[in-house]
């Protein structure tokens, strides 16, 4: 890393620790400590069982409907709590949700690009996140709120139930246009057995 890049990486690292560290919820990973020792940055966090939700986004490996609904409700509750603490995650996606199948417990992780919404550091014009899961206002670089996290959670729900994303494109520009302007494919055309 160049000096400037290294500083930016460190700032993101410690921002994640500070942001997640102020949140105390059973479905948000707990951060116990963060620091730097001998030029090595560290975060001491809760040990999590399980793995992320990415394997369950494949059409041949979907979780049962009841499991998905219960899990999404828990993640929504965790996000509602974060939003009451003025924290918007900004990158909700299956890779950032750890899941313990034995206890049906999801944990929201990776607050690295989260923003404290009452902070002066919240800016418009900056696009951060994973495009397939981003809200139209986030793609446009507008100031975002908790509703953007809920849009991303809805995209994740769609993918966990159907094995496909609601918006796809052959290029980044086409994907962004579709998210901003098109309606998603009706999930019942993909999974007519859903209630």
List PLM regions with ranges:
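Conserved C-terminal C-lobe helix
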Residues: 193-195
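Conserved ATP-binding/catalytic core of the eukaryotic-like protein kinase fold
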Residues: 1-185, 189
């Amino acid at each position: 890393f160049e000096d400037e890049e290294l500083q930016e990486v460190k700032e993101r690292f410690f921002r994640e620790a500070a942001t997640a560290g102020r949140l105390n919820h059973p479905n948000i990973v707990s951060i116990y400590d963060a620091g730097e020792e001998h030029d090595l940055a560290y975060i001491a966090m809760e040990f999590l069982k399980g793995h992320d939700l990415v394997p369950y986004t494949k059409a041949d490996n979907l979780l049962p409907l009841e499991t998905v609904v219960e899990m999404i409700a828990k993640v929504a509750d965790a996000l509602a709590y974060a939003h009451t603490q003025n924290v918007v995650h900004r990158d909700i996606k299956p890779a950032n949700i750890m899941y313990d199948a034995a206890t049906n417990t999801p944990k929201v992780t990776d607050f690295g690009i989260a923003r404290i919404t009452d902070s002066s550091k919240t800016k418009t014009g900056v696009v951060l996140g994973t495009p397939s899961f981003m809200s139209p206002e986030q793609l446009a670089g507008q100031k975002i709120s908790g509703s953007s996290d809920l849009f991303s959670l809805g995209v994740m729900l769609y993918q966990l139930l159907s094995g496909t994303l609601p918006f796809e494109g052959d290029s980044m520009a086409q994907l962004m246009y579709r998210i901003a302007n098109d309606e998603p494919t009706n999930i019942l055309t993909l999974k007519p057995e859903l209630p």
